[in-house]
Structures are given as structure tokens and as C-alpha cells.
């Protein structure tokens, strides 16, 4: 595993947010149904990645105390994100169930809080991708990074509308999207180097990363995909994402 590969993957994960923002510029108006289906598919991929690529390896690497390390890591990761959520609410908690309602008030301060929240939440997601590389399983790490990147595309699409409605210029809007993506790049590098330097923490770190991903899926992604009347489609999309990740894991494993 080379640092160059980790860096390129980190740039890809962070760049997915920018790609989503550019899509929103190109297509102007993206339907809730489309974004919900894409986000649900990403949730399925991330769910499988969290279990297959992070939590199960944590049990394996932990040896005799694997179960203790894994359970402790999962809850620690979830509680850390829960604490961040209390300090800086994210996605559906700021935007609300209806994005148009948010766009209509044009509150710049609320928009900036929204973008800051996404940036802060991107850090642990980046760390999760980096930790997976630290395990040494390149195929698993790439699948996990791919799932996180896929989730970043609709997130990047969500950033643009409220900022433009609040009067922020297109150039500054794109710069904000780039900043949120950069945070994820930094998080990926932090996660990778942390477990590379201190390999003893790998079982706990893997479970911690898995816990953060499970929290994001349950607390943010699934509620967001069910907020606009596309619950059935989102559910099947999540299952499709999960099964695709499962098939990929078996074929590449």
C-alpha cells in the first residue's frame, strides 16, 4: 500500500463532493426522488462496507479481545458523532424535511452553518476511509472509499441550492464545496497514518470507523431518503447497494 494510492483515493473521496456540486450547476434542479434513490444506494454500499470491511476485520484482528474492542469501538464512534451532532446539527436537522422551505428563507447564516456542519461531519467519514487502508486490505479499502464517495455526490448536490438562494456567488459556492471535500481528504490521511504508526490500535480504530458509518447511515442518510415520499424506492435502492457491495466483496475477496 503506497501513500500515493491513499492520497489519490482521498482526493477521489473528497472530489466526489465537488462532482456532486458541479452536477447541480449543470442540471440546475435535481428531483428529490433521484437524490433520495442515489443516497439510499450509497447507504446500502456503506452499510455493507461498515460490516464487511471494518467491523468483521476488527473482530478478526482483535484476537482474544476482539469482541470487546469491536463493541467498544462501535459505540465510541457512534457517540463521538452523536456529540458532534449536538454541537453542529447536520443535513435533515438543519435543512428540514423540505429543501425548498430552506431555500425560500435565504438565511445566509443558516446556510453557512449547514456547510460547516457538512465539513465537520466529513472528517470522521474521511478517517473511516483512511483507517480501512491502514488494515492493509486494499480491495476492501477501495470499496469502502467508493461507498463514501458515492454518498458524497448527493451531499455535494445538496450544498449548492441553499447557498445560491442565499445570494452566494457561484464561484464562492464552488469554493465552499471544495473546502468540505478537502476536509475529507485530510480525514483520510489522518486515519491512514494513525493506524500505520500505531498498529496496536487497528482493531479499535476499525470498529470506531464502522461505528461512525453506522451512525451516519441510521441517523442521517436513511431519514433523509425517507423525507420526500420515496421510502419504497429508497429501501430497494439501499438493498441493491448492500447486495452490490456483498457481491463485490466475495468476488474480490
Predicted regions and their residues:
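Intrinsically disordered, metal-sensing/regulatory segments
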Residues: 1-253
